[in-house]
Amino acid sequence: MRNSPVSPGPGYAPARGSERARRRGVARWLAYVGGVFAGAWLATQLYYAVQIAMWSVFDPGSSAFMRADAWRLSNAQPATTIRHRWVPYDQIARTLKRAVIASEDADFANNSGYEVDAILQAWEKNRARGRIVSGGSTITQQLARNLFLSGERSYIRKGQELIITWMLETLLDKERIFEIYLNSVEFGRGVYGAQAAAQYYYRIPASRLSAWQSARLAVMLPNPKYFDAHRGSPYLAQRAGVIARRMGAAELPASQ
């Protein structure tokens, strides 16, 4: 008697179909989640771009860094206040403008917001240390970070910083970028902008800063809270002398 062919048994085909359905479900879920993240990312970039475009006409009230610092200070010392007062570009001494460029970004007037060599050097230093310790930041990159981003050090934040830098350089002219920078950068504990710094350290308006005063303020920028607390630092005086000698060669951005 000839045996009948053995069937795969009940449930075999449905099991394969169930596996395919499960994979399709996972793929759809991943596509949905990816779409949500992509949409949120694009919305964030649009928000940044709109804000920057508005600042071609309106002055920023405060920066993300300033607001975060105000929150930290209010928790640590409730009596501490943020010192900040916006002044137009032409009311900031040319000596301070030249000193900041000489100290922070000598090619600011001509670069595109990035210094590739500095970024590569920072990358090598970070790779050697196994963590982010340097960013190779131009004035525009510093402004991008101060206006919108947290103090966190990560490659994701650095990537966002580069995107915002491109937006700033595309939507604003160099003089406007520098004006916003000088009015929002930190000069000490709770001290933001050229006017507040001039009044806090020298009891004068930003328009009357001397070359030596400007050089000292510019040297404070990489570590303002430290130098606020150590104003007699020999390094501060020595470095200010170096910057004072370089100021004459510093090129200011052209007026538009």
UniProtKB/Swiss-Prot annotation:
One of its GO terms (molecular function) is peptidoglycan glycosyltransferase activity. Pathway: Cell wall biogenesis; peptidoglycan biosynthesis. SUPFAM superfamilies: Lysozyme-like. It is a single-pass membrane protein. Its EC number is 2.4.99.28. GO terms for biological process: cell wall organization; peptidoglycan biosynthetic process; regulation of cell shape. The chain crosses the membrane at residues 26-48. Keywords: Cell inner membrane, Cell membrane, Cell shape, Cell wall biogenesis/degradation, Glycosyltransferase, Membrane, Peptidoglycan synthesis, Transferase, Transmembrane, Transmembrane helix. It catalyses: [GlcNAc-(1->4)-Mur2Ac(oyl-L-Ala-gamma-D-Glu-L-Lys-D-Ala-D-Ala)](n)-di-trans,octa-cis-undecaprenyl diphosphate + beta-D-GlcNAc-(1->4)-Mur2Ac(oyl-L-Ala-gamma-D-Glu-L-Lys-D-Ala-D-Ala)-di-trans,octa-cis-undecaprenyl diphosphate = [GlcNAc-(1->4)-Mur2Ac(oyl-L-Ala-gamma-D-Glu-L-Lys-D-Ala-D-Ala)](n+1)-di-trans,octa-cis-undecaprenyl diphosphate + di-trans,octa-cis-undecaprenyl diphosphate + H(+). It comes from the Bacteria. Belongs to the glycosyltransferase 51 family. This is Biosynthetic peptidoglycan transglycosylase.
